[in-house]
Amino acid sequence: MKKLLLSVAALALSFSSNAAETLTIGATPVPHVEILEVVKPDLKSQGIDLKIVEFNDYVQPNTSVSDKLLDLNFFQHRPYLDSFIKDHGSDLVEVGGIHIEPIGFYSHKIKDLKDLKKGATIAIPNDPTNGGRALLLLQTAGLITLEDPKSISATPLDIKDNKLNLNIKELEAPQLPRSLDDVDGAIINTNYAIDAGLNPLKDALFIENADSPYVNVVVGNSQSVKKDSVKALLKALQSDKVKKFINDKYNGAVVAAF
């Protein structure tokens, strides 16, 4: 982690002399980096050099932007951003919404949710917003009932009815695809599912509705969001070109939200 932070710091310092023309953004590989690569040439033609730093966790992209090591990030949905700001008191600011990644239930051991046995172990993300989102999906699938059926911040302690006595195991989101051989099922964010070679539309036994409120957003800090280059990036990301790329590349597993 220290090595990665040092590399981000070095990257930020190396571009500081040309900040007006260089825009730095941290992103998780799939689909975020892939989407950013689509608009890179368009920004280049406008004199903007988009530098992308890849991350594989849900914390460092925000701290890097908050600490002014990067201008922007693109990896999280709105509820996660709101939760992070509340917990850390940072000056992160949403720039705009780009897409939705419906979260899904995956398993290497069963072919249908009705095949789940009593006491089965289900892995979910351990961060508050994605954990709550996973529990809401289990509730929608009819496997559990929550004390507050609409709470996006629910935890396993908020489960009111659990007829199968499911064992809810909380893991770091990037670890969930690797856990499939060890658990009966896992609820996995689409970016990590795709990155692991899973097809959300074919492999998920149950998937979130496409009208989910969990829109993935580009995020900056109070200084970076004032840059004209950030406005240019958002315009490029919310273009027909990007919408077509999302539709063609992900075939419904990722849905444009603009």
Language model feature labels by segment:
Residues 132-139, 237-257:
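Periplasmic-binding protein-like
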Residues 95-144, 243:
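A conserved helix-loop-strand patch within extracytoplasmic ligand-binding domains
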Residues 1-19:
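Gram-negative bacterial Sec-dependent N-terminal signal peptides
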Residues 54-58, 68, 72-82, 98-99, ...:
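Beta->alpha turn/N-cap motifs
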Residues 20-30, 48-54, 121-122:
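Short, well-ordered beta-strand elements
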Residues 83-95, 110, 182, 187, ...:
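Ligand-binding "clamshell"
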Residues 102-113, 215-227:
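A bilobed periplasmic-binding-protein/Venus flytrap-type ligand-binding module shared by bacterial periplasmic
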Residues 53-63, 150-178:
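Short helix-initiation/N-cap motifs at beta->coil->alpha
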